[in-house]
């Protein structure tokens, strides 16, 4: 950990910049604790943000420590805010644990951005509405401050990509790409037309981010 903070100090001396973005896919909480302690021990004045996994390890005490050391924001994937689908994709978190994590972060002055997903195989329209409702409530309570929806993409190394039958999906013929062949085209019987939800999800979230639209019925966003 001292090496990381040594490099931070070197970059500050070289550039004069004191803001840092750590690009780990999900920074380990234990590592972040050590980082915060080292920053505070050296009395550095910095700001930083990173990607995290929303789990119960982020206690109020840890989030206070992170904030005190200069952490101003985190981003993490809530993905589908549906208990059934979260379990299906083996996310390893629950709605309840993620919410508690977000609460601890936000109450300590750390901005929370979350990545959201729709169109996972077997997901229903009702589950999509329920997910949007949970996201609305998180914004209303001030537990998240920014969010972005993306359409589910099946990748070759994911559990669903390796075993599509487990989510009632089938691989389709893939046209080779000279750059990369990570994403796998797939099909699902009786799948909703997810494309008709894209604009509504974006518009709803845009409003929630600005603390408006909480009283709009969920289905009205998709008219």
Where are these regions (language model features)?
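C-terminal structural cap/anchor segments
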Residues: 105, 112-117, 126-127, 131-134
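Short catalytic/ligand-binding loop motif for oxyanion handling, primarily in non-cytosolic enzymes
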Residues: 29-31, 121-124, 155-158
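Conserved SAM/AdoMet-binding glycine-rich loop
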Residues: 5-111, 120
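Structural beta-sheet core signal
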Residues: 50, 114-116, 149
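Hydrophobic, well-ordered secondary-structure elements that form the walls
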Residues: 22, 76, 114, 135, ...
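C-terminal accessory regions of radical SAM enzymes
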Residues: 126-223
